[in-house]
């Protein structure tokens, strides 16, 4: 977390608010799995806050707002099944489909037969 005693304060109150909002959203982002809709929307909100000018922030927000309004709480935790083409996306770093559905993991069990 950002330590105000070790780092410089932003030049304006707006900068301080944006910095605190980004730090909060980063903490919320950690509660979502990387391949979920909620994670993607949090990343989009962070990009809205990080926009340098009002027009860019407004354009980004108008793209994010409809997705936020139509998404239910359960949809935010569900995996995203849309194909993604960005190389830095966390969805490309880990594969969900590593194991087949019918294969179960075996556990070592001690021999419990009586002699």
Swiss-Prot record:
Keyword vocabulary terms for this entry: Host cytoplasm, Host-virus interaction, Inhibition of host innate immune response by virus, Suppressor of RNA silencing, Viral immunoevasion
Subcellular location: Host cytoplasm, Host perinuclear region
Any one cellular-component term (Gene Ontology): host cell perinuclear region of cytoplasm
The keyword Transmembrane helix belongs to this UniProt entry's keyword annotation: no
GO biological process per UniProt: negative regulation of gene silencing by regulatory ncRNA; symbiont-mediated suppression of host innate immune response
Domain of life of the source: Viruses
Keyword Repeat: no
Signal peptide: none
InterPro entries xref list: Gemini_V2, WCCH
Protein's job: Through its interaction with host SGS3, acts as a suppressor of RNA-mediated gene silencing, also known as post-transcriptional gene silencing (PTGS), a mechanism of plant viral defense that limits the accumulation of viral RNAs.
Subunit details: Interacts with host SGS3.
Family per similarity comment: Belongs to the geminiviridae protein AV2/V2 family.
Protein name, as recorded: Protein V2
Organism: Tomato yellow leaf curl Sardinia virus (isolate Spain-2)
